[in-house]
A protein has these predicted regions:
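Structural motif
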Residues: 3, 95-96
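Active-site proximal beta-strand in glycosyltransferases
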Residues: 3-5, 112-129, 144, 155, ...
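N-terminal strand-loop element at the rim of the active site
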Residues: 6-77, 161-164, 175-176
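Alpha-helical elements of Rossmann-like donor-binding domains used by nucleotide-donor carbohydrate transfer enzymes
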Residues: 20, 51, 80-87, 107, ...
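Nucleotide-sugar donor phosphate/pyrophosphate-binding loop at the beta->alpha transition
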Residues: 76-83, 118-120, 128-146, 150, ...
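Glycine-rich phosphate-binding loop signature in dinucleotide/nucleotide-binding domains
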Residues: 88-95
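Short His-centered aromatic/hydrophobic patch
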Residues: 99-104
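A short, active-site helix/loop in glycosyltransferases that binds the activated sugar's phosphate group
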Residues: 150-176, 183
Length: 183
């Protein structure tokens, strides 16, 4: 049975965008784990997060609390989260890590490289785009370009991101969200 870790900074992202993927993986008899911050930074209520955790449990999905901060500038908190993530990876042999969100994606790809686990990163819209503030380009573009080289499959949501990723990012594979999911 394939074991897949679905990783994001916060639980609300998994709830709002990944439940169909989680169900699909379970239907394919994958052992699915979700790792994210169930406590802080979510854009849904604590009650909704509790319901979401119950839904995951009913599907047989294992949950891991990772204390990520949404901001990349909370370095100590995110360093602790990275240590927690590495502990999860040490405890279970994962066949794939599916990363979402900029912070979760960076730490997930770093950990995947350290543990030699194939990694998928879905960019739900790069923070650098035509018309974005210069600050976004200076901060996010070089980081995403660097970590794309540690990415087996980079999935983009919109055509601008896809075109830029193909031309500049150099992931092993780049796909549009409109293509079939790579599981």
């Amino acid at each position: 049975m394939k074991r897949v870790l679905m990783l994001s900074t916060v639980a609300s992202l998994q709830d709002q965008f990944n439940m169909a993927n989680i169900r699909m993986l379970r239907n394919l008899h994958c052992d699915v784990h979700v790792a994210c911050n169930f406590v802080q930074g979510n854009n849904t209520s604590p009650q909704r997060i509790a319901v979401f955790q119950n839904e995951l449990a009913a599907l047989g999905v294992t949950c891991h609390q990772i204390d990520f901060a949404r901001s990349p500038f909370h370095l100590l908190q995110n360093h602790r989260a990275y240590q927690q993530l590495k502990a999860v990876l040490r405890a279970d042999a994962f066949d794939c890590i599916d990363c979402h969100t900029p912070v979760g994606g960076i730490y997930g790809r770093q950990a995947a490289a350290a543990f030699q686990i194939p990694v998928i990163y879905t960019a739900h819209g790069f923070h650098f785009f035509q018309g974005a503030p210069l600050w976004n380009w200076l901060l996010f573009y070089p980081v995403e370009k660097y970590y794309a080289r540690k990415t087996d499959v980079l999935i983009t949501i919109n055509s601008e991101d896809y075109d830029r990723a193909v031309r500049k990012m150099h992931a092993q594979q780049t796909r549009s969200a409109r293509s079939r999911h790579p599981y």
